[in-house]
Amino acid sequence: MHDVIVIGAGPVGLASGIEAKRRGLDSLIIEKGALCNSFIGYPTQMEFFSTPELLEIGGHPFPTRDYKPRREEALDYYRGVATAEDLNLRLYEPVTDLRGQDGAFTVVTDEATYETRKVVVATGFYDVPNRMDVPGEDLDKVRHYFKEPYPYALTDVAVVGGANSAVKAALNCYRHEANVTMVVREPEFGSGVKYWLRPDVENRIEEGAIDAYFNTTVSAIEPDTLHLDTPDGPASIDNDFVLAMTGYKPNY
């Protein structure tokens, strides 16, 4: 029997595994995908808002080229930490069941059954997109994750959402020759939009380079058209892709 099993091999899961090992506990980290699997899905050239010292774990310094780390630097860093700490990892092994009580848990995966006294659930919040629940949302043209702008060059792209991820996706697509329309449920962009992003997107909207509908929701999605509920009534726009940057929630 293990002393502790950690479900999830992201930064929090790795930090938990490091602490358990340093306390002399028999620990195991189980991850359904790759190491730091959520980071794999982040935009390819993403830059973190946090500075390196806020992302460090286990006392390992996080060297970066710039003031704020990029996605590939984070992936390299956490892989290096996991290797240096010689953590007991099981990757690409989804947990299918967790049962028991404090002191006696059973963790079932696709490959094995494990017994443990304690469980740390560190699965993050990037697995389950917040759906719009509208007709057509399951079309292939609808994406809940944004990797890079290149597939959307010279197409009509609607970006749904008003937070940082939506703003960054819209600006990236615009700068790669996409015809961008933003659909924002609120009357303005969220208060958490970073100070260097807000004036950029607002200026692009003001000059007409990016179209924007505020106080607006998506009512339906068709292969070539996006239907909207706006303050002025129903509207329809030409559309090739929908980037639904509507946030995420934990998978439990």
Go through the PLM ranges and name each one:
Residues 40-75, 209:
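Glycine-rich active-site loop/strand segments that organize a redox cofactor
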Residues 1, 6-32, 145-190, 252:
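Rossmann-like dinucleotide/flavin-binding elements
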